[in-house]
């Protein structure tokens, strides 16, 4: 089955993450110096790497054969997190699991130690979608978190997250990725995929993506589905210009 480019080329290490050097450096230093916190909040526009960094971090703190601060990607824990068979790393979409009962179930789970990992990691995406009661339940866990639990909250709307939650998290602001960084990544991916992408086309896609790497790769995917020779005219045609 064909895998979309944004999924196939999702960064697997901190080194692969484009345009967020300050954040990846800080996270790597915490791992290397064993100063991992119990709660983080990643905020920024869509497609800037929040969930990707959360997953890399979750693997890195639990990896059995870590390469510096990066996960090896090959050990049973890394592969198990990738394929969903390791239950100690849980990704929750708050948009569809936003009730107090969902968070109470999570709270009950945190009482148990990890089965195969060092840490249980809960990645709560679009956390701003939680109900007021759910936020209150989450706060109760975060006030006295078990030592084996890490929360990584991700949001595109930080202003909707209660101050009581924010004050208990390390905050990292993901910025829109610079067009030149997106352009470079597009040209690299195109080369690996044997797609003939012109620099002008890469630059145009980078501008259309408005700082979101995921969107840029999706546009490239759409264009390459029409022709393997992607120039600026192809991009304009597919973008409806």
Locate predicted features.
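Extended, largely alpha-helical regulatory/partner-binding modules appended to the mid-to-C-terminal parts
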Residues: 23, 59, 73-76, 80-87, ...
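P-loop/Walker A NTP-binding region and its immediately flanking N-terminal helices
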Residues: 1-171
């Amino acid at each position: 089955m064909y895998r979309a480019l944004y999924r196939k080329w999702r960064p697997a290490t901190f080194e692969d993450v484009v345009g967020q050097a300050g954040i990846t450096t800080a996270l790597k230093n915490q791992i290397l110096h064993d100063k991992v916190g119990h709660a983080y909040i990643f905020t920024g526009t869509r497609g800037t790497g929040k969930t990707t960094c959360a997953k890399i971090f979750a693997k890195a703190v639990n990896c059995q054969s870590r390469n510096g601060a990066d996960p090896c990607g090959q050990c049973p824990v890394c592969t198990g997190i990738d394929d969903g068979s390791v239950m100690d790393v849980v990704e929750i979409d708050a948009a569809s699991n936003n009730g107090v009962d969902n968070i109470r179930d999570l709270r009950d789970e945190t009482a148990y130690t990890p089965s195969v990992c060092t840490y249980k990691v809960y990645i709560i995406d679009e956390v701003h979608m939680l109900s007021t009661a759910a936020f209150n339940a989450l706060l109760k866990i975060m006030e006295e978190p078990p030592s084996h639990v890490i929360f990584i909250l991700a949001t595109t709307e930080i202003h909707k997250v209660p101050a009581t939650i924010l004050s208990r998290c390390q905050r990292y602001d993901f910025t829109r990725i610079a067009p030149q960084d997106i352009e470079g990544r597009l040209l690299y991916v195109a080369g690996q995929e044997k797609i003939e992408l012109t620099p002008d086309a890469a630059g145009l896609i980078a501008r259309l993506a408005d700082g979101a790497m995921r969107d840029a790769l999706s546009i490239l995917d759409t264009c390459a589905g029409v022709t393997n020779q992607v120039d600026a005219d192809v991009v304009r045609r597919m973008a409806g210009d």
